[in-house]
Amino acid sequence: MEKSTVYFTDFRCPVGTSQLDKLKKLCVAAGIKDIDMDGKFVAIKMHFGELGNMAFLRPNYAKVVADLCKEQGGMPFLTDCNTLYPGSRKNALEHLDCANLNGFNTITTGCQIIIGDGVRGTDEVEVPVVNGEYCKTALIGHAIMDADIFISLSHFKGHETTGFGGALKNIGMGCGSRAGKMQQHASGKPAINEEVCRGCRRCAKECGSDAITYVNKKAVIDYDKCKGCGRCIGACSYDAVYNPNSSANELLDRKMAEYAQAVCHGRPHFHIALVQDISPNCDCHGENDAPILPDIGMFASFDPVALDQACADACLKATPIENSQLGEHLAEPGWHCHHDHFKDSNPNIEWKATLDQAEKIGLGTREYELKIIK
């Protein structure tokens, strides 16, 4: 496969030019206007942020993309699917309330918001996964598959289970219905090392399923409630929470890549990622820790695999922020440095598996040429 082209612009803005201007220029340079959108539905997939989280992308960025689509005669809508775990986005009504409270509405974004898998998270389409090894079919939100054109607008940041969240996670996990998310997470559930557990209760606070209680000051998981989402693993600073299935995170990564392929296959797709507010964990949390790396810039490409690889490469070259989860880990005496910012922030991850699987099944390539837009 030939190298893909990824376009990049930084966040430096001379007087009279805004970040929104630069985002529009980036998208145009990357070829968004080459897509025939006239009279067609355009799904713009993004994350509206959990209530309490402040790291998610601002709605202003979404409006730039929506306006570009409308200029080309397209009919855009913002979309995301409901979450597997309880929170403010577990059904469409609460999800829409959450989006509105976080600033996403028709005025701020210039388009409608549609929750992809319906009121209860059960409005799904079973989509074949071409060349799938782990998933022969994927359960994708119905509204997302109804669109003629698919665009992902992703906040690139760290993630406690997948290493980072970029385009492939935004597409693969994000477009899965609640049952689709369960299928991806079904490779294993966490366990507690009682000898290491300090009873700090941080894992229980992060659990979205109310599945963790404490007995004799030690965490105990109720597996009837546990969804296997892995948030508790990222929450523990002492490695007391772990997945006994050593390959579970890698299996999740590979399934996620196959779900992304199911979403994109057979229709025009375009991808944008903003590498800013690089928190160590997912925007699904009701909080966001300090950024682990400085803001880097904006990327766009027709290839989501190359896009994620370019974002990851840029992050790996960046200097860690001292007062952050990553900086604190690197400063710990005896810390085993992985020379990988994502793995040093969240050691129990295998982020390269997602890109490897996505490339293997033909979604894109990890080889890219970076073109810089001033």
Task: Tell me what each language-model feature is.
Residues 66-67:
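Terminal amphipathic helices with adjacent charged low-complexity linkers/tails
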Residues 2-61, 71-80, 85-374:
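Extended, low-polarity segments enriched in aliphatic/aromatic residues
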